[in-house]
From Swiss-Prot:
InterPro entries in alphabetical order: UPF0182
Compartments where found: Cell membrane
Source organism superkingdom: Bacteria
Family recorded in the similarity comment: Belongs to the UPF0182 family.
Descriptive protein name: UPF0182 protein MAB_3498c
GO CC annotation: extracellular region; plasma membrane
SS bond list: none
Source organism of this protein record: Mycobacteroides abscessus (strain ATCC 19977 / DSM 44196 / CCUG 20993 / CIP 104536 / JCM 13569 / NCTC 13031 / TMC 1543 / L948) (Mycobacterium abscessus)
Pfam families, alphabetized: UPF0182
TM regions (residue ranges): 19-39, 63-83, 114-134, 176-196, 211-231, 260-280, 288-308
PANTHER family in the cross-refs: UPF0182 PROTEIN SLL1060
Membrane topology note: Multi-pass membrane protein
Amino acid sequence: MGMRPNGALPRLTRRSRRLVAASLVIVVLLLIGPRLVDTYINWLWFGELGFRGVFTTVLLTRLALFLIVGTLVAAVVFAGFGLAYRARPVFVPAKGPGDALAQYRALILSRVRLFLIGVPILIGVLAGVVAQSYWMPVQLFLEGGDFGIKDPQFGLDLGFFAFDLPFYRFVLTYLFIAASIALIVNGLVHYIFGGIRLSGRSGTLSRPARIQLITFAGILVLLKVAAYWLDRYELLSHTRAGKPFTGAGYTDINAVLPAKLILLAIAVICAVAVFSALVLKDLRIPAIGLALLLLSSLVVGAGWPLIVEQFSVKPNAAQKESEYIARSIKATRDAYGLTDDVVTYRDYSGTASSPAGSQQLAKQVAADRSTIANIRVLDPNIISPAFTQLQQGKNFYAFPDALSIDRYQDKNGSLRDYVVAARELDPAKLRDNQRDWINRHTVYTHGNGFIAAPANTVRGVADKPDENGGYPEFLVNAVDDNGKVLSDGPAPLAQPRVYYGPIIASDTNDYAIVGKNGNDREYDYENNAGTKNSTYTGSGGVPVGGALARTVFGLKYAERNFLFSNVIGDNSKILFNRDPSRRVEAVAPWLTVDSGTYPAIVDKRLVWIVDGYTTLDNYPYSQQTSLSEATFDSQVGRTGGALPNQQVSYIRNSVKATVDAYDGTVTLYQQDEKDPVLKAWMKIFPGTVKPKADISDDLKRHLRYPEDLFKVQRTLLARYHVNDPVTFFSTSDFWQVPDDPNAPTGSQPPYYIVAKDITKNDNSASFQLTSALNRFQRDFLAAYVSASSDPETYGKITVLTVPGTVQGPKLVNNAITTDNQVSSHVGIIKNQNILKWGNLLTLPVANGGLLFVEPLYASPGQGDQSSYPRLIRVGMYYNGKVGYATTVRDALDMVFGPGAGATATAPAVEPGAMPPAPPGGQNVPVVPPVTPPPTGSAELSSAKAAALQEVQRAIGEVKEAQKSGDFARYGQALKGLDDAMTKFTQAR
């Protein structure tokens, strides 16, 4: 029986080799097949949108990086392996029958090509796969320009830090990786083949091994020299624990920066020492050099800066760091768009100039018509269930949990804000046979309508249990039950069918198959004659009628019906990737997309408007900010919409994008004409972003100042409004974003409102994004911030700074909710209703005053699906006085005196336009018709005190009637309470 040589691999039969080859082919197809299918489908999809240039540019850049980096790393590793193998000793004696090295040698020798070529290729492929994801820094390096601003330390244009430095670090990293792996591989091969021999504490090194290892080690040291050089520049954007700002501080400039230069010089000397061993043949010299470099990095690089920090900077930190804090203040304002030409600060008293309760003050309040007439009583984060119950129409239609705010001009030409939503199809709500593949993807394909509700009014007054008031006043654009386009909304809409939107795209298998193939198939509307269908005629969609298209989409969605179903014909198209934000991210992968996508009627088309940001993470001296943390608030915690956990030090709302809700067309517009980052991307992807001049006037009227950007800016304004570096260091004048008083966690979100224009400082109506800011770790107001969304003043931020005695949102909310009248009323109705306080708005009024407005909503029962909220009261607070009434007008009169609410928008009362009553009549929130008086009886007359006791007994009877569930008894109790209140009012 023949014996196999020690360490040799067994030889496979021809059949075995074929099986192995077939298995490898199958594995490869399983690995790369789905990627090839996705690549082809993406090629089709980008072509349909007109952005195929983006797809090919990204693909070719990734492919080029994969090949270049992979080839470079593979070549260097191959050199390390091949040089060691070629220089191996001719004869290496085995140490014995169990010599492991001899077995490794035999293994390599039996498959030399496999190891010599396969190992470098494998490492190169891995390196290339990782490197191709860095296509953005490479493209920015190739096309990036200047900022026109120089850094304060080195005097270099900021374009070097934004575009060049990341690329240099990328190249250096992969050179270091390649050289390190080559050194390790070279050493291992020399060791296996006897070029390196270890015995006890000593060892021998062949001449080729010494030359090669020294060469690779010397290259690594030279790369470290380059790393020290780049480290100097990266100091300007680094953070350190305990330092209150981003960028190089006193220790960095006076200790770390010189240390980097010293270490650089030592590294050069070390490199010379290493390479000297090629001539001197003495390894002690490079060993001493490397030890010196290691010791120096500990002493000079870490020890010396620590000493300077502890004994020089910390005892005098405010003075030592002031110069660098000033740099950070300026850079942060520049990087986040908070410069003096954008932000205006004005002192604001917080209290009107006229005395409280005076007739003059009431007239001043009423004169602020732009604010008073537009006080928002609908909270878009609360009233979605009312939209669903009253405007859903079909079980498969839906609205988002958090609705949007936009503005339109009403019939009188006045600017008015509206709560808006598109009525989308929700795949998750399809039931039973509706979920069949044909119905799901070819019948239920789209939503129907744009719903708007004026934010400053409701239908009727929720004053009595049997009245159906307090619900939104709906304006609808939709296909009605006669097949005609109903256009009663705030603007005319030609096509209300919604094929693209975030809800319809929420399903994992988000696609619809449309197009003429026989009879109309898509569900459209119903009337007495039955169900009416329609056929999609838009330009969107990828043709799916051919055999190849059917096959690839069948593979993508793992669905055989693509191949066998006769509902797919020659004219069929597939609509997929229908989420507006994801579509924008796909065609502009360099953008960070705002979480607040909203629908708008623009030029008679329904579009989704998406805000896009360009960002950097290495702007010198600019404060590093986490987008996810800065944009998190109480509503994000509830709805889940948030920006990614990304650190940035520069942000611009550089792009406004629209996505057509019918045909899916994506259009990118240049919003910031000065942004160097956007200019670079426009060079990389020419023709993809339209110039700002192409934005239509109608679209301009619907562009909002983006909420996520505003959240980031207000977080930074809380600190970087401070001009003096010493004051900044002490934090004594810092502000902070207040907590939401109506949520268990999270900060108060900013609010869109229509109010008087504080940017122009006149009484014209302006659409603004606003927020209150508290004093640092206190509940008193520090500032009121407003960002204009008006076309003429878009992006201008006004900050009203107020004295420290003005109460903040939490204290105001406490004052309203604990007021005797409010708490008594709430105590009566809360047993049978779910109560929710809405957004607490802060509104400048009456030449110096601040009015706080907080609506109260009631939903019947315990929050089941048939329960939906309506406005029952409006709470107000001004300068220590609380108003609480069924209408804005009455609440204003309570706070400021008669006449203050004269210009407020009254509830609509047309009975014909009232929304339908809830089924069964028992899900209407139970609302007492009167407000009980204060419970205290101090300083009351005997008649008044007796009347008060009657009121309190009547309140108790109302509560008992509620518990009993006897509606007749409850009605009698309410009448008794009404009579008691009348007697109390008339008592003297």
